[in-house]
UniProtKB/Swiss-Prot annotation:
InterPro entries: RNFT1/2, Znf_RING, Znf_RING/FYVE/PHD, Znf_RING_CS. PANTHER family: RING FINGER AND TRANSMEMBRANE DOMAIN-CONTAINING PROTEIN 2 (PTHR15860:SF2), UNCHARACTERIZED RING FINGER-CONTAINING PROTEIN (PTHR15860). Residues 13-41, 92-149 are annotated as: Disordered. This is RING finger and transmembrane domain-containing protein 2. Gene3D superfamilies: Zinc/RING finger domain, C3HC4 (zinc finger) (3.30.40.10). Residues 203-214, 277-329 are cytoplasmic. A zinc finger (RING-type) spans 384-422. The gene is RNFT2. The lineage of its organism: Eukaryota, Metazoa, Chordata, Craniata, Vertebrata. Keywords: Membrane, Metal-binding, Transmembrane, Transmembrane helix, Ubl conjugation pathway, Zinc, Zinc-finger. It is a multi-pass membrane protein. GO terms for molecular function: ubiquitin protein ligase activity; zinc ion binding. Residues 131-140 have a biased composition (Basic and acidic residues). The keyword Secreted does not apply.
Length: 444
């Protein structure tokens, strides 16, 4: 009888255990089996024994003398998933947890601290998960690092900061220099304004061709001559005109600002002379010099002027480099003079080449096209596209466009393409054939 009862109890225990493990889905095999087993009371595994057998001593009274009594550790729970190959162990709870549960009267689930897995795929996925988390944290840490500014930007900020701090002192220094040389600055501004006015007026008269005004040309000549004579007379004690003929002006010392003063006055005077010579060319009537040929003379005058302007400062720079003080180093002065001479020789060679090309162009005739027939003029509308008047000595270009000869020559003195089709009509662009004068300040 008692064997039958024990057999029933063991079968119930097996059915309870199999129901707890077989009902778990495959993807929730181990963790939920652990939670279901852990949610049972520590002594609840044997509650079925207590329910059916109210008094264990009565059931096993016949074997009390032959079977030793042993206490089952209520806190030890063994479990295994059905067919999963995983074994998990719940370690005994501490005394504090047991006491707390007893006092509270309710069981609070606590996650197990240690899990032992048997299966290569679970270990591999866990390592991959940990490695991925580690890489993710490292990438987030790299993204959070503040970017450093570029070196060029930091240097620019430093320069701007320095300028903000030093700008007041720079302005004070400039104000002091301007006050010391106020007379020279005023004279240079006046001469520059005179040059700009005369140059623009002359170009306007050149573009008018035969309709130019002789009175305006005479006014330009008188205006330039008056300014030149006034400046030279005002500073006659310095004998600034000597620099125009490669002589030394009358100055006790020659510092850097004195050098700029003498070179600047000489350069402006030579520009005035250049404009005056071009005014004489403009004033010549058509009988003496044709309008289409005047551009060549403008070019020759300008190239000769630039060559002469580049030669004037040489003796002044030699004087400034060597100096009047005997304590100066002759070796350093000699080296600087050699370097200056080399640089200046390249500049002069370029100027000489420009003069040679201008003279060659002056001696050769330039044909931009051939004479147009009456039929070609009729097909073109009998109106010049440049002057908007009837054709006078019409020329036809390779692009089959017809223009007046004078209009075409004046146009090609500034441009190198056809006014209508923009096809190339001349090989090279020739500057200074429109009567303009270079505003370049020849300081060296």
């Amino acid at each position: 009888m008692w064997l039958f009862t024990v057999n029933q109890v063991l079968r119930k225990m097996q059915r309870r255990h199999s129901s707890n493990t077989d009902n778990i889905p495959p993807e929730r095999n181990r963790s939920q089996a652990l939670s279901s087993e852990a949610s049972v009371d520590e002594g609840g595994v044997f509650e079925s024994l207590k329910a059916e057998a109210a008094s264990p001593p009565a059931l096993f009274s016949g074997l009390s003398g032959s079977l030793p009594t042993s206490s089952f550790p209520s806190s030890l729970v063994l479990g295994s998933s059905a067919g999963g190959g995983d074994v998990f162990i719940q370690m005994p709870a501490s005394r504090e947890e047991g006491g707390g549960r007893g006092e509270g009267g309710a069981y609070h689930h606590r996650q197990p601290h240690h899990h032992f897995h048997h299966g290569g795929h679970r270990g591999g996925s866990l390592l991959q998960h940990v490695g991925g988390d580690h890489r993710g944290h490292s990438e987030e840490g790299g993204d959070e690092q503040p970017g450093t500014p570029a070196p060029a930007l930091s240097e620019l900020k430093a320069v701007i900061c320095w300028l903000q701090k030093g700008l007041p002192f720079i302005l004070i220094l400039l104000a002091k220099l301007c006050f010391q040389h106020k007379l020279g600055i005023a004279v240079c501004i006046g001469m520059a304004s005179t040059f700009a006015y005369a140059n623009s007026t002359l170009r306007e008269q050149v573009s008018l061709k035969e309709k130019r005004s002789v009175l305006v040309i005479l006014w330009i000549l008188a205006f330039l001559a008056g300014n030149t004579l006034y400046v030279l007379y005002t500073f006659s004690s310095q004998q600034l005109y000597n620099s125009l003929i490669f002589l030394k002006p009358n100055l006790e010392t020659l510092d850097f600002f004195d050098l700029l003063w003498i070179v600047g006055i000489a350069d402006f005077v030579l520009k005035y002379i250049t404009i005056a010579l071009k005014c004489l060319i403009v004033a010549l009537p058509k009988i003496i010099l044709a309008v289409k040929s005047k551009g060549k003379f403008y070019l020759v005058i300008e190239e000769l002027s630039q060559l002469f302007r580049s030669l004037v400062p040489i003796q002044l720079w030699y004087k400034y480099i060597m100096g009047d003080d005997s304590s100066n180093s002759y070796f350093l002065g000699g080296v600087l003079i050699v370097l200056y001479s080399l640089c200046k020789s390249f500049d002069i060679c370029g100027r000489v080449g420009g003069v040679r090309k201008a003279l060659k162009l002056l001696c050769t005739s330039q044909n931009y096209g051939v004479r147009a027939t009456g039929q070609q003029c009729t097909e073109a509308g009998d109106i010049c596209a440049i002057c908007q008047a009837e054709f006078r000595e019409p020329l036809i270009l390779l692009c089959q466009h017809v223009f007046c000869e004078e209009c075409l020559c004046l146009w090609l003195d500034r441009e190198r393409t056809c006014p209508l089709s923009r096809s190339v009509a001349v090989d090279t662009l020739r500057c200074w054939k429109d009567g303009a004068t270079s505003a370049h300040f020849q300081v060296y």
